[in-house]
């Protein structure tokens, strides 16, 4: 016979049925309880004691619990690990409930919807994707700030890159994923996948500025958030369309290899461009700076607008110092507004709002003192919101606590009735003191005192030795070992007045605070707009501080130009780490007629640093920053593509060579004449002649068909002869100094090709045994005295070229164009290469 389930457990099971993919925290009195499999798993993850309900039954129910006052800590831990948590609250007072207490889920907290993040600076983006007619829509929002955006993309790879850049932890999918897509999101990107296929009619977004697919994706994201949060989200901004082409395009591989916002070793901020440029003083400014680095501008007018203000701040040290001090007093307005919207704002949050608003006049005044036209727009957007600051300052006590149940929140004078209750409490305290003094005098009991506890209320404390002096109007309340507790009619009357005043005072104060919180909601939009303006001011002062500290200059950017001229350029991050005194600056010159710079030189000599230096300088310039150089004249680039470093993609089963070819293909397919391409040692992942052939073919293809400014570092010295064949290619090399058998890398870029690779010298630096090095040197001398086993690649008649094939050259080119490389497997790609080789 099956065991009968109690009404309480049946209620739990009914609720759990609606949330099978979440841990269900079931409120029971002062605890949140977990049962069955949830209890077993949570006990292990959270290190809770696993016990059981109905221990003596045949099938005891596993159970674990957490105190309600500490629940947030445990919920955060589960969410940080990628789990969902459904919170079921008691919907009525258990003392007044008839039968079982009503319970219901009031919120589902997920990795993408949590607003109480441990790191209050970083965004916490929730993304959603939808698909129709071979097009994707990508929408994202940050519930903790209210940001809500959407765009449409043509390729799945662009979707993946966008999500990776946002560092999202959860994705809402609006269509069934195939197996490969699930693998990418779950295994490679470690995303929690949630589904939202339907859109409730009342949540359908139909904005004219969005495509139908964008409206659909944004609607599904909004529906998911409403379904999980179960509350009005007044802080969510209207969904905003954005275009990838409005920004400098940087794919995830490029951002990773250039270490823009996360270093490759630890995936942390230290040692990145973000780390270097971050002198922001507000949380909003820090988030905005990161978004600027993720999405540099392509509009010269927008870039110059930022640079003008950076220049103003740079030229006015004292005003900038005052501005920095004022910014330090501004709290995270975006997160505070979100907490108000979520109904989670506590008294301290309102004090932070008031303190933040009190600094706005100072910020505004500094911009007025500077009296620069470039600051007019920002100055006009600084809304002091005097109504809100006045409301908070009149209502909230400066000594208010973090909780809303402890009292002491509302200021004296804000509410007449509350003041009366407080007066009664204060009078009661003085009445108690007077009664104690009177009874001491009447009874002659010098040790008599009035105390209070929850059980007995107010009482007279009298020791055992004084019991014979107790007056007749006292009545016994409790007997202890060495003393007794007594009451009196007068003490009881005072107590009743005080308890009523305390209860009513507490209740009224709570209601007043909730009213204040509700009234503040009308200012959320203005707070968010103010936060955005302050964030922008903060970012611009940050760039000016870094420019001054590091000795940067304002670059000249010319729209439509193809001239690159950087004098005394430095790698911004490397210089900051090692110090300006030790860093060797380099010029970078790519005149109108030069598209490709072929860079040769030994390993460890600085080729990669030189190339990264160029890319970082471009990115810095296009976010509006000054740059590390003596002078810099740059075109405006539309995209940067990089292939730097060798690495296998073990998760997707791709070898180093396959990753190289995939990234090279991506650059070749997407680059335009306005792009910057950086290829470092392309072709090293395969056999020497295969690698050399492919490297040359790629150089020729970029030269003939794309015309992008390209830095191509190679260890194939034979490729340096290409400058005789390709009009828009120049050779440069990293200079070395040889003296008495010793080699010094000068880290200086010089015109012309390198004549040696110095591989054995690099091995010596690495500490290989001397005997081994001497043997290697001997072998090298023998090899250098032998003729090459095949004709030199640069021999004019035998040169491999995509454009000097025999009669079938156009046929081969058409074959390459006709291949959908994105969908080829590694095996198919290799077979295709062999097929091309056979047809040469």
Curated annotation (Swiss-Prot):
CDD domains: ABC_MutS1. GO terms for molecular function: ATP binding; ATP-dependent DNA damage sensor activity; damaged DNA binding; mismatched DNA binding. GO terms for biological process: mismatch repair. InterPro entries: DNA_mismatch_repair_MutS (IPR005748), DNA_mismatch_repair_MutS-lik_N (IPR007695), DNA_mismatch_repair_MutS/MSH (IPR017261), DNA_mismatch_repair_MutS_C (IPR000432), DNA_mismatch_repair_MutS_clamp (IPR007861), DNA_mismatch_repair_MutS_core (IPR007696), DNA_mismatch_repair_MutS_N (IPR016151), DNA_mismatch_repair_MutS_sf (IPR036187). It comes from the Bacteria. ATP binds at residues 601-608. Keywords: ATP-binding, DNA damage, DNA repair, DNA-binding, Nucleotide-binding. GO terms for cellular component: cytosol. NCBIfam families: mutS1, PRK05399.1. Belongs to the DNA mismatch repair MutS family. This protein is involved in the repair of mismatches in DNA. It is possible that it carries out the mismatch recognition step. This protein has a weak ATPase activity. HAMAP family: MutS. This is DNA mismatch repair protein MutS. It comes from Lactococcus lactis subsp. cremoris (strain SK11). The gene is mutS.
